[in-house]
Amino acid sequence: IHKKIYRQQSFSNETGNFSINDNLATHTLFIVDEASMISNEGLSGAMFGTGRLLDDLIQFVYSGTGCRLLLMGDTAQLPPVGEELSPALFTDALKGYGLEVREVDLTQVVRQVQDSGILWNATRLRELIAEDECYSLPKIRISGFADIKVVPGEELIDTLTACYERDGMDETIVVCRSNKRANIYNKGIRAQILYR
């Protein structure tokens, strides 16, 4: 997104400021996947546009003649850090820009095997959220699935190393309960396993 909607305005001392680019496109549909990650939390001293990515994206797209925006993402994913909801997937927030908004939910999973424990748990959680019955963290079913393995902390580094070697990084996932915990795990994995 940043590469498309921002242009470098000035450059000094290793930092640059970027302003919203001109949208020269006409009658173009801009498609943004993983839109749940788009934040609109204002950043003081931001070097990109207004510091509010969703505001800047919408301003850029709709400044072009006849341009439209398609935002795709999973509303059940964690919202951007510091936000309660993913603003780019929240219909009322988008209507606040004066946009005509259409919302569609896709319910058929095509990228997971049907006997996946991850899929089973994600589907159950999504159903609880849709029924507005998710008042506390539900019990996650972990037994009986080939794609779920519970690993004690002292075995985590060895297990992840083995999984990366056997299955590859793209096929190995660590599930965390928060963005904060995911950042901690990511730093540890980079430092102790990937040596970055």
Segments (PLM) and residue ranges:
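Conserved ATPase-coupling elements of RecA-like P-loop NTPase cores
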Residues: A35-L54, T75-L85
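Conformational gate/switch positions in structured elements
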Residues: I1-K3, R7-Q8, E34, T75, ...
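Inter-Walker segment of RecA-like/P-loop motor cores
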Residues: I1-F30
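Conserved helicase NTPase motor core
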Residues: N23-V32, I38-N40, L57-I58
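Loop/turn-to-beta-strand initiation segments
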Residues: T26-L29, G64-L71
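Catalytic-core regions built around general acid/base machinery
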Residues: L53-S63
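Conserved helicase motor core of P-loop NTPases
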Residues: V61-C67, A76-R196
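Short loop/turn segments at strand-loop or loop-helix junctions that form parts
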Residues: F30-S36, G73-T75, L106-Q108
